[in-house]
């Protein structure tokens, strides 16, 4: 992933935004024909390459042709590795040319607030029609009453585990280690048996912050105070979390995880190398899709030997870091009106449902409408993902998930704090380093 240094980030955040025009979609749908302005319009939509490939196929094979038929808009869908999205945004904003709509993750919208269009009219319309947005979506994408992006979906990670291997060490019939101490003890037994845990400490967008931020919070650690300005990382709770992480890493984990990206643990689990990893549901869905390809050591389908659980509890509580997905309308776009009509249309219930159903529970909708969807009744192994928007905490805690918090997560400061410690830096020094890096950002 191309890194964004502080100078580039500040320059990017100061770029000008272009106000967006508004336009209703109801008339288009009622008339059954595309509006005149859109006959020759092309909207370029940049997204991540989905960890549920079937969903990208729905977009390409169904949504693209339906978009042109309904709106007269040619949809240019481009998918790339999520780790490359931020570099792409930087180059597009600096050149004033690029995709009209870019889907981003987490609280990244706060980095680009000055370079994106106001989409309040679109977001309010969608939210009102679909039961209102989750607090997480509103907190990230609504700034002082203005929507800087249209929330698309909310994903996140749970522990993906091998049922039979946990059974062998005494965790059967739905039981699972509840605390970090219990999870570490289980992990030591499993690693000694050749089945380590797998967790990344690399610079990768999802699995790294998705594990280490909730881990920090569960010990009572936090980046800043509630004022969003006073850096509070250098605390006993944080130091204790780092000390425990060093032992946890050595006792339980595949130490190659220092260099893993978001796909590495998928491959490790599917190949039978690891027994537990924090991940979205993509491992399970891939194993279920190819039951003859992914087998246990006994030759049985791997997907039947998988279950999902939340991360363990600590002295500070039990948390998750939901992954917010947001569509940004870029300020440089010369297709503001067409892009807004596209956003209204693709986020509307009948269109979005096609994509949402193909996810099979990998993500929740950003609005509360989707927690009642029948997809959650299909497979009980997927059901725990439904509740992630309600149990999550956002980066920047105990302050807001603002631009500074987005810079910290983009620079992987919290992840690197733990990575430095497991590679030999004393816990106190690792925390001091991270504290000083946060001060640079928040000052």
What is each PLM-predicted segment?
Residues 1-19:
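N-terminal secretory signal peptides and thylakoid transit peptides that target proteins
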Residues 39-41, 70, 145, 165-172, ...:
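Extracytoplasmic/periplasmic substrate-recognition and gating elements
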Residues 74, 91, 167, 194, ...:
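Conserved C-terminal helix/tail region of periplasmic/extracytoplasmic solute-binding proteins
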Residues 105-158, 184, 211, 301-310:
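Hinge/lid segment of periplasmic solute-binding proteins
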Residues 120-133, 176, 203, 219-240, ...:
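Short, solvent-exposed loop/beta-turn-alpha elements that line the ligand-binding surface or hinge
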Residues 143-152, 157, 181-231, 237, ...:
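Extracytoplasmic/periplasmic solute-binding protein
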Residues 184-190, 227-259, 307, 311:
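Glycine-centered hinge/linker elements that transmit conformational signals in sensory
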Residues 301-310, 357-420:
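Long, aromatic- and glycine/proline-rich binding clefts that accommodate carbohydrate-like moieties
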């Amino acid at each position: 992933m191309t890194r964004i240094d502080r100078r580039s980030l500040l320059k990017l955040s100061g770029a000008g935004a272009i106000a967006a025009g508004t336009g209703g979609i109801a008339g288009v749908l009622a008339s059954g024909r595309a509006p005149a302005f859109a006959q020759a319009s092309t909207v370029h939509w940049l997204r991540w390459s989905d960890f549920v490939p079937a969903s990208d196929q729905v977009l390409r094979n169904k949504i693209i042709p339906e978009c042109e038929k309904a709106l007269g808009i040619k949809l240019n869908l481009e998918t790339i590795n999520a780790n490359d999205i931020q570099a792409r945004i930087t180059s597009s904003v600096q050149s004033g040319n690029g995709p009209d709509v870019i889907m981003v993750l987490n609280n990244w919208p706060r980095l680009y607030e000055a370079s994106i269009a106001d989409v309040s009219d679109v977001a309010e319309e969608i939210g009102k029609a679909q039961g209102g947005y989750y607090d997480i979506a509103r907190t990230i994408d609504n700034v002082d009453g203005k929507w800087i992006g249209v929330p698309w979906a909310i994903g996140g990670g749970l522990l993906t585990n091998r049922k039979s291997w946990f059974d062998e060490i005494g965790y059967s019939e739905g039981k699972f280690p509840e605390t970090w101490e219990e999870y570490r003890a289980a992990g030591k037994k499993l690693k000694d048996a050749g089945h380590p845990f797998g967790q990344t400490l690399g610079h990768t967008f999802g699995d790294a912050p998705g594990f280490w931020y909730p881990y920090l919070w569960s010990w009572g650690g936090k980046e800043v105070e509630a004022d969003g300005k006073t850096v509070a990382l250098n605390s006993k709770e944080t130091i204790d979390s780092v000390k425990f992480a060093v032992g946890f890493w050595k006792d339980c984990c595949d130490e190659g995880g220092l260099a893993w990206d978001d796909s590495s643990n998928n491959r490790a689990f599917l190949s039978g190398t690891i027994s537990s990893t924090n991940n979205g549901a993509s491992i399970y869905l891939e194993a279920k899709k190819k039951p003859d390809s992914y087998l246990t050591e006994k030759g049985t389908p791997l997907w039947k030997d998988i279950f999902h659980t939340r991360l363990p509890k600590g002295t500070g509580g039990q948390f998750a870091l939901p992954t917010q997905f947001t569509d940004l309308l870029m300020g440089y776009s010369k297709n503001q009106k067409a892009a807004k009509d596209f956003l209204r249309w693709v986020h509307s219930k009948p269109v979005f449902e096609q994509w949402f159903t193909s996810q099979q529970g990998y993500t929740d909708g950003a609005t509360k409408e989707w927690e009642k969807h029948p997809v959650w009744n299909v497979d009980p192994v997927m059901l725990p993902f439904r509740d992630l928007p309600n149990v999550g905490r956002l980066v920047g805690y105990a302050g807001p998930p603002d631009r500074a918090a987005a810079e910290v997560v983009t620079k992987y400061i919290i992840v690197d704090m733990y990575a430095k410690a497991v590679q030999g830096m004393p816990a106190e020094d690792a925390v001091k380093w991270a504290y000083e890096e946060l001060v640079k950002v928040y000052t």
